[in-house]
Regions:
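Terminal beta-strand-rich extracellular "head" domains
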Residues: 72-73, 79-84, 96-174, 178-219
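Extracellular repetitive beta-rich solenoid segments
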Residues: 1-65, 100
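Extended, low-complexity regulatory regions
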Residues: 91-95
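Extracellular receptor-binding modules and their adjoining Ser/Thr/Gly/Asp/Asn-rich linkers
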Residues: 65-74
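Membrane-targeting and insertion segments and their boundary/processing signals
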Residues: 18-22, 77, 151
Length: 219
């Protein structure tokens, strides 16, 4: 209650004046071998680490793990046709890294996708620039990953696919990631549905969901 805090802040009868020990927003109050001490606010993204009995706490950088996760989910189906890389629907998300040394793990999963027996290629973009693509070799196209359209003679089948890439943006500024696609001969790409769109209950006509995820991870 207020009366007890007033007494603590005014050092009670023989304590240290808390008001003169912690002076800045974000300060942490702790006791060392002689009395109360101030630990100033740490670097953004760092955590408070105990060093055990007889040692003072410190701010420390995480040695691994996920710092934050952003995701985009597409539950509806759509089609797209282009022979050159173009943004794939609304597959887009933004993330702001907390450290320039951290990486961004990009993951995409398409519940069902087909391109009428033709190959489709996909790339990730970071603020409009392609990332995570294969090395240049002659005149060959470069992509993050590709799929081949289903080879079923019946067009009511489609398969899911997934891909993961680790990006190294080396920034603490906001980043927008997107997925782009291109299809062989500009054929139609079907997302979250098969080519044949029969309105029946057979599972091969299933509508599916697709997900795009960005996770900041400590390298």
């Amino acid at each position: 209650n207020a009366s007890y805090w007033t007494k603590l802040a005014a050092k009670g009868t023989d304590g240290t004046d808390v008001g003169t020990t912690i002076t800045t927003q974000g300060d942490i109050l702790y006791r060392d071998g002689s009395g109360l001490q101030r630990l100033g606010a740490g670097t953004s993204g760092y955590f408070l680490k105990t060093q055990g009995t007889g040692a003072n706490p410190v701010w420390a950088e995480s040695s691994g793990g996920v710092i934050q996760t952003k995701y985009f989910i597409r539950n509806s189906s759509f089609t797209q046709s282009t022979s050159s890389f173009t943004d794939l629907g609304d597959f887009s998300l933004s993330i702001t890294p907390t450290s320039t040394s951290n990486k961004i793990k990009l993951s995409v999963f398409f519940g069902a996708i087909d391109s009428a027996g033709n190959t489709s290629a996909f790339v990730y973009t970071r603020n409009g620039s392609q990332v995570g693509i294969g090395n240049a070799e002659g005149n060959r196209a470069r992509a993050s990953f590709t799929i081949q359209g289903t080879s079923y003679t019946a067009s009511n089948h489609a398969e899911g696919t997934s891909h993961t890439f680790i990006d190294d943006p080396q920034t603490t500024s906001a980043i927008t990631y997107k997925i782009q696609s291109a299809t062989e001969s500009g054929s139609l790409l079907y997302v979250n549905r098969p080519r044949d769109d029969g309105n029946v209950s057979d599972i091969y006509y299933s509508r599916t969901t697709s997900t795009f995820i960005a996770q900041e991870i400590v390298a």
